From Swiss-Prot:
Identification of the protein by name: Large ribosomal subunit protein uL16
Disulfide bonds: none
Pfam families, A to Z: Ribosomal_L16
Keyword Cell wall biogenesis/degradation carried by entry: no
GO cellular component: cytosolic large ribosomal subunit
InterPro entries (UniProt xref): Ribosomal_uL16 (IPR047873), Ribosomal_uL16_bact-type (IPR000114), Ribosomal_uL16_CS (IPR020798), Ribosomal_uL16_dom (IPR016180), Ribosomal_uL16_sf (IPR036920)
SUPFAM superfamilies for this protein: Ribosomal protein L16p/L10e
GO MF, one example: rRNA binding
Lineage: Bacteria, Pseudomonadati, Campylobacterota, Epsilonproteobacteria, Campylobacterales
Organism name: Aliarcobacter butzleri (strain RM4018)
Quaternary structure and partners: Part of the 50S ribosomal subunit.
GO BP annotations listed: translation
Gene3D superfamilies: Ribosomal protein L10e/L16
Job description of the protein: Binds 23S rRNA and is also seen to make contacts with the A and possibly P site tRNAs.
């Protein structure tokens, strides 16, 4: 699973996820990609499930880039625990996703196979996404 090697602080405040993505909103390496259309949070298990779905579909012919990294700790208290007694322990690592953010990129295969593989990965994500290409990436969200 993806997670930082070390952080300055173990726990982080929840914060807010507002606005559009100003960086990471265009294809950097590949010819096809998955772009977020709405706000959301992606965790390391969802990233890994999407990566496995894509690579199995293309049978390792394509190069896949993961353009997101979960760097925010999400805490949870144990079940049947009373309120209080401090913040819970770190449960999983997530990344806040803003609309316009490219999550995955792919190159090295035809457009039809790439669209099928990216569609499989899109089903693993908890927010609405769309497939973009080098030609269509400048469209509105």
């Amino acid at each position: 699973m993806l997670m930082p090697k070390r952080t300055k602080f173990r726990k982080m405040m929840k914060g807010r996820n507002r606005g559009m993505a100003h960086r990471g909103n265009s294809l950097a390496y590949g010819d096809f990609g998955i772009k977020a259309v709405e706000h959301g949070r992606i965790d390391s298990r969802q990233i890994e499930a999407s990566r496995i779905a894509m690579t199995r579909k293309v049978k390792r012919q394509a190069k896949v880039w993961i353009m997101v990294f979960p760097d925010k700790p999400l805490t949870a208290k144990p079940l049947e625990t009373r309120m209080g007694k401090g913040k819970g322990s770190v449960d999983k690592w997530v990344m806040n996703i803003k609309p316009g953010r490219i999550c995955f990129e792919m190159a090295g295969v035809g457009e039809e196979l790439a669209r099928e593989a990216l569609a499989l990965a899109m089903h693993k994500l908890p927010f609405k996404t769309k497939i973009v290409t080098r030609d269509s990436e400048n469209e509105l969200y």
